[in-house]
């Protein structure tokens, strides 16, 4: 293995997920200023996620054709330029917010870079743990949920894009200096070889399982700030804290899931996860839907003044 590369992959993944998810914690404040309705706000939040899903194919292809490190550097530069333009030029319309979301999709595609970069250094029996450690970088969503709404309240949500550039530039330099491609990487395949994977029935099943698990995680994480604001009347900062707690739990369990998959197999681990997740979501659906049912002091402390 190569611990510095594993660390670089985690850091790159962590900060990439922070900015990929950035529009979620800022959604309430952006929607208020741009006068967006609920549907527009939802699409704005979903755009980086959808773009990231598609761009993972491109980034995965670049990993094979160039190298994971080169692909990671290119993706980071694109995101940094997009955030710099959003900070300096500003986001003044719904369409501009969607355009920013498209470019932030490159941050979401970091998944296709960080995992191969880290796992290719390790033998098969340890790849689950390596990918779990690198994959724990989705904790970057916790950073966005914790700090983005507060920074927006202090300096304006447009300036949050500028604040995000500081850790991103530090990560870019660290990644360039520390990360190394594995000496025995798989050779690049022809385009037809990629298409053959689509003929494998198991591939479709695993893509479906992944869309439910990780798609559910990032989808809920992006929607929770708006949900807490709409359903419970929480202000954006408090909604960010609540969301961060939910996201942190998922990020904390990811390395444990990788280690468990190494011991008992991926299928059994997925079955356990689906069972537990289904029970938790069912219990969550039984909770009070209105903050009015909470004790008075809690309701007054976290209330968010609504526009009439």
Language-model features, listed with the residues they occupy:
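Helix-to-loop junctions at the C-terminal end of transmembrane segments
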Residues: 55-67, 253-265
